[in-house]
A protein has these predicted regions:
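A short hydrophobic beta-strand element
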Residues: 118-128
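Sec-dependent N-terminal signal peptides
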Residues: 4-13
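Hydrophobic pocket/interface hotspot
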Residues: 51-54, 65-67, 74, 88-92, ...
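Short, low-complexity N-terminal intrinsically disordered segments enriched in polar/charged residues
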Residues: 16-60, 68
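Short beta-strand edge/turn micro-motifs at domain boundaries
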Residues: 19-22, 139-166
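A solvent-exposed, acidic/Ser-Thr-rich amphipathic alpha-helical stretch
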Residues: 67-113
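Short, cysteine-centered beta-strand-loop-beta hairpins and adjacent loop/turn segments enriched
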Residues: 101, 129-139
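Positively charged n-region of N-terminal signal peptides that target proteins for export
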Residues: 1-4, 17
């Protein structure tokens, strides 16, 4: 009888199904603006892949590759400018024509959203070195946010940090 009860218990345990419910972990807080108090949560790495494709094309100075993951026109907040630039493919081609090469080395990617947001954001910290055709070199430490909707980047916001000389 003990064997039958033991077998029934084992069979019951084996037949149990564990349901894993994935709940987004919310953390942090928006401190300013209309979404003050909203929490952040992580999103899919598919968004990271979109940004990686963009930056690979950026490093290769390949506008056609860039526009595989960019909308036809994007809003680009360049770190050195006070106002955003509305950039299309022709603008990017013209912009890149001043450079011999570009090297952007990324330190990390964080895909996220805040509560109620419909687009996804990938935050990126990187070092970017651009070599101009006139021989000058632009060297920046960047923090950027890439805004994605329907699998395409529609806005890029960039901030630059001063190099520590200590």
């Amino acid at each position: 009888m003990k064997k039958i009860i033991t077998l029934l218990i084992i069979a019951t345990l084996i037949s149990c199904e564990t349901n894993v419910v994935k709940v987004p972990v919310k953390a942090g807080e928006i401190a300013l603006g209309p979404n003050t108090g909203s929490k952040f949560y992580l999103t899919s790495d598919d968004n990271v892949d979109i940004v990686k494709k963009l930056l690979e094309s950026w490093n290769n100075m390949d506008p056609a590759g860039m526009f595989e993951v960019l909308e036809d026109t994007i809003t680009w907040y360049v770190a050195s400018e006070k106002k955003p630039i509305v950039a299309d493919k022709n603008f990017i081609v013209e912009y890149m024509s001043a450079y011999d090469s570009i090297s952007q080395v990324v330190q990390g990617y964080i895909p996220h959203q805040y509560e109620g947001q419909t687009s996804n954001v990938v935050s990126v910290a990187s070092r970017e070195t651009k070599f101009k055709k006139d021989g000058t070199v632009e060297d920046d430490r960047l923090f950027e946010r890439f805004f994605i909707r329907n699998g395409k980047i529609f806005r890029v916001m960039a901030w630059s940090a001063v190099w520590n000389t200590n």
